[in-house]
Amino acid sequence: MTVLAWCIAWLLDFVIGDPQNWPHPVRWIGNLISATQRVVRRYCHSDRSLRIGGAVMWLVVVGVTWAVSWGVLALASEIHPWFGWLVEIWMIFTVLAGRCLANAARDVERPLRAGDLAESREKLSWIVGRDTSQLQPEQVNRAVVETVAENTVDGIIAPLFFLFLGGAPLAMAYKAVNTLDSMVGYKHEKYRAIGMVSARLDDIANVIPARLSWLLLSIAAALCRYDGYRALHIGWRDRYNHSSPNCAWSEASVAGALGIRLGGPNDYFGERVEKPWIGDAQRGISVDDISRTIRLMWVASTLALALFIAVRCLLVGAA
C-alpha cells in the first residue's frame, strides 16, 4: 500500500499539480517561519544571537512540521486505515512540485514564443531571485532552464529521497528545510546571520539528492535522445561551478545534455553577482530548450520514483 501511495501521489502531481487555493502545507510552513522569525528578531539583535536564534527557528519549524505530520497521519490511521492511506497520499502529493515547476516554466515560455518579452520577464520574476527587467530572450531562456534544472532536485528528487528514508513525515520535514532556505537562506545583510543555519542545513540535506540527479538526468538524457554521455561528463566536470555545493550537479547535467551554457553573471537585489559558466556553448540557447529541460525533469523524476520503489521492494517488500 505504501508503494501504491507513492505512485498515486506522483501521478496526481504529474496530472494536476497544486490547484489554486488548495490547502497546502508549504503555505502553513511559510506562516510558521514568518511567525518564528518575528520572535527571533524581537529578542536577537547581534549577529551571534541571530545565528543562535536562526538555529532555534530551524529546530522549531522542522520539528513541528515532522511532529504534526506524524501526528495527523497516525490519527487518520486510527480513525480508519483507508483514511490514513488517503492522508498519506495527500501529504506526498503536496511535497512534490513537478507540475507546478513545469507550469511556471511554460508561463514564461508561452509569451516568449509569442514575442512578448515584457510578459515573459514578468512571469520569470515570479520564480527567480534575479533582476529580470532588462533580460534579453536568450537570458530569459537560460534563467528558466537553470530554474527547472535546479528545482528538479529540491522539488522532486529530494522529496522522493526523504520519502524513501522516512515516509511522508520526513518528506514533509524536508519541505520545511527547503522552505526555510527559500525564505531566509540568503547571503545579503538582512538574512546572513539569521539564515546561516537554514542555508547550511539545506545544503547538507541535498547532498545525496543532487548527486543522484546527475546520474538520473544523464540517463534521462540518453532516453530522450539527447547527449547522455556529455550530460554525465559535463555534470561531473562542472559540478562545483556554483556558489552552492549542490546546484551545479543538475544544471551542469542539463547543460551537457543539451549542448548549451548556463550560469554566468546575474543581478540579485541590485548587486551584480559573477558566477562561473556551466557547460560548453555548442550552440546558442533557445526557447525550445525550456521544453527539453521540462522533459528531462519528468523522465528523471520517473526514474527516481522507480529507483526508490525498487530499493524499497528489495529491502522490505512491496508493502
From Swiss-Prot:
GO terms for molecular function: ABC-type vitamin B12 transporter activity; threonine-phosphate decarboxylase activity. It is found in: Cell membrane. One of its GO terms (biological process) is cobalamin biosynthetic process. Keywords: Cell membrane, Cobalamin biosynthesis, Membrane, Transmembrane, Transmembrane helix. Pathway: Cofactor biosynthesis; adenosylcobalamin biosynthesis. It holds the Pfam family CobD_Cbib. Its main location: membrane. The keyword Transmembrane helix applies. It is a multi-pass membrane protein. It comes from the Bacteria. The chain crosses the membrane at residues 55-75, 78-98, 153-173, 296-316. Coiled coil: none annotated. InterPro entries: Cobalamin_biosynth_CobD/CbiB. The keyword Membrane applies. GO terms for cellular component: plasma membrane. Converts cobyric acid to cobinamide by the addition of aminopropanol on the F carboxylic group. NCBIfam families: cobal_cbiB. Belongs to the CobD/CbiB family. This is Cobalamin biosynthesis protein CobD. It comes from Citrobacter koseri (strain ATCC BAA-895 / CDC 4225-83 / SGSC4696). The gene is cobD.
